[in-house]
Amino acid sequence: MAQKLWEKNVRVNEEIDRFTVGRDREMDLYLAKHDVLGSMAHITMLESIGLLTAGELEMLLAELKNIYASAEKGEFVIEDGIEDVHSQVELMLTRKLGDVGKKIHSGRSRNDQVLVDLKLFTRAELKEVAEEVEQLFHVLISQSNTYKDVLMPGYTHLQIAMPSSFGLWFGAYAESLVDDMMFLQAAFKMCNRNPLGSAAGYGSSFPLDREMTTRLLGFDSMDYNVVYAQMGRGKMERNVAFALASIAGTVSKMAFDACMFSSQNFGFVKLPDECTTGSSIMPHKKNPDVFELTRAKCNKLQALPQQIMMIMNNLPSGYFRDLQIIKEVFLPAFRELKECLQMAAYIMDKIKINEHILDDNRYLYIFSVEEVNRLASEGMPFRDAYKKVGLDIEAGKFTHDKKVHHTHEGSIGNLCNDRIESLMRQVVDGFNFSVMEQAERSLLGR
């Protein structure tokens, strides 16, 4: 078994080692590229304060770029007996460069190293999630505009209630995504602060230039207090998890609607054939499996904040190994959500709409409020109009022309989609991803 970075004269029990390392080696592959970027910024700073020579920095940067390239191509591995990505990178540098490779850990702990890895990984993933949300948003706005005049029943308590439209239905989920993106942006801003230099959570006697690493990595600012930087472990993941859960909640609800509306009892929409499956016994079946799985995965994602909170529950300040377990639920969540967003965008783009739903007289009573409002507009007291229409319904005498004239903001005839699009543009622009992208390109010399 390879020697641990922290190992002294007492050999480690292999069973205990397997238990304590757990799935860290598997999870740390998510962080490999980001560990290299953090190390590049750190050693550049070390050279500036005299802890590395210019020649040593040049050698280290060149080799770190090679390691980054292998991670980018999916070829980076953590060898048997090596407990984490930090140990693997340092081992590779030491094999290649000898004692120079052993210098990169000056002024650093694996505590702040994993903190910066997690933040670099998370902000990169948040950018990809934001892009997928924006793609789904544009599909929904386009469909809302296309079908703005197609009426459908609106429901309360799953009882037919009032006229709605596909313009409203698609647009409602688009605007929900705007709110979700605001949540995501807040999580990004909390994530985009530099913990590097906090070491084990109590700083360092080396004269570290934390402003320099903040700038090199493209962070907005830093976690200034070194104790708080470590306290932020788990808190950052929890905050991001709430944002992911918010998006997942929107997608799950939309998937439920689409599954229900595509059933024969509703018949409002038809899902793409390639997104349905058949039955082994019933030849007529077209089951909405893709959206059912999307709904289930999104419901699972909505539990993520609670999982993280329970792992960190009642921990005092400082680092604890409990926090390692968060990676197992947090790191894979991004891919799962992105896949759900991609499936949702595909289905909602190809979904077919029934444009004649309200021809069926079973939906006649959704126009009851329209009739009440018409009578009230002609001078009848609203409560009297309400009573008259109710009695007409009970007597089987209610009729209506199945037309609506709604003009106020956000209604059937005035969707305000242009304003919703403007809100989304403002939120997207507020992320300012270009700063982090430029910083990372500069570190890599690209």
Curated annotation (Swiss-Prot):
Example GO BP: arginine biosynthetic process via ornithine
Gene3D superfamilies: Fumarase/aspartase (C-terminal domain) (1.10.40.30), Fumarase/aspartase (Central domain) (1.20.200.10), Fumarase/aspartase (N-terminal domain) (1.10.275.10)
One GO CC term, this protein: cytosol
Keywords of the record: Amino-acid biosynthesis, Arginine biosynthesis, Cytoplasm, Lyase
GO MF annotation: an example: argininosuccinate lyase activity
Location of the protein in the cell: Cytoplasm
EC number: 4.3.2.1
Pathway: Amino-acid biosynthesis; L-arginine biosynthesis; L-arginine from L-ornithine and carbamoyl phosphate: step 3/3
Reactions mediated catalytically: 2-(N(omega)-L-arginino)succinate = fumarate + L-arginine
Chief location bin: cytoplasm
HAMAP family with a match to the protein in the record: Arg_succ_lyase
Family assignment from sequence similarity: Belongs to the lyase 1 family. Argininosuccinate lyase subfamily.
Protein name (database record): Argininosuccinate lyase
Source organism (scientific name): Phocaeicola vulgatus (strain ATCC 8482 / DSM 1447 / JCM 5826 / CCUG 4940 / NBRC 14291 / NCTC 11154) (Bacteroides vulgatus)
UniProt lineage: Bacteria, Pseudomonadati, Bacteroidota, Bacteroidia, Bacteroidales
